[in-house]
Amino acid sequence: MRKLIFITIMLCITGAFSARAQRYDRGFDLNSSTFVEKGTWMVGGKVGYSTHKNDNYRFLVIEDINSTGYRFTVSPMFCYMIRDNLGLGMRFGYGRNLLSIASANINIESVGINVKDYFSLSHDFSAMAVYRNYIPLGASKRFALFNEMQLAYGVGEAKIIDGHGTNIVGSFEKSHSLSLGINPGMIAFINDHVAVEFNVGMLGLQYSNVNQTHNQIYNGNRDATQINFKVNILSLGFGLAYYL
């Protein structure tokens, strides 16, 4: 009986080691095809602009919204391929956001809140180190997936004003942020050198600090840490890139 138990245990251990020793082949090798060659430079970027205007608009419990605003962003980038399908580079970003609310009313049962003459203007700058890995789709030289890891540092300023005439209150903010993010995407060449890229923010860790001065008298400070492990549909991005 002891011999039978011993033999059974040895067979289980041997089978486990044999299973681990065997490599399961799914039929593709990431190094079998070169999508972007070593020594290639990539220069690209993104530009975005959006604007809105509300005239007596209603959204859920917010009524009589009269507001205007816009958002402008630009993000140039360069990358050098240190190996086939593998590159290191830098990305820079600038954003400007303006929101002006002439009036808006919030009505929740018997509670009413009125917002009038609200103005906000903010600027933000960022610089990030980029590590990009291309994943060829078979032997295709036109389409591929890529994964971009970003380590970024950003600074920003914001001005907030509320009121009109002599009854005006205002705040000034300075912010600093440090983030680590993963942005997978897809690339498609439209000719030998120009490509269109699509990417989405999926994974991120961010720390931010905001220092606020209210009415040039009162000071406040806020620290925040955020971790995201999900697809962020608000960070969908399109861009153009030139490879040379």
Language-model features: locations:
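Residues that define the transmembrane beta-barrel architecture of outer-membrane proteins
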Residues: 39-41, 68-74, 119-127, 143, ...
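Extracellular loop and loop/strand-boundary signature of outer-membrane beta-barrel proteins
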Residues: 57-64, 111-120, 134, 165-172, ...
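Short coil/turn motifs at helix boundaries and re-entrant loops, enriched in small/polar
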Residues: 39, 76, 109-110, 184
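Outer-membrane beta-barrel translocator domains and adjoining extracellular loop/strand segments
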Residues: 54-61, 100-109, 157-168, 209-217
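Short glycine/proline- and aromatic-enriched beta-strand/turn motifs that initiate or cap beta-hairpins
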Residues: 21-80, 88, 233-244
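Gram-negative (and chloroplast) outer-membrane scaffold detector with strong preference
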Residues: 47-49, 79-165, 231-244
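Bacterial Sec-dependent N-terminal signal peptides
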Residues: 1-28, 244
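Predominantly the C-terminal beta-signal and adjacent terminal strand-loop region
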Residues: 185-244
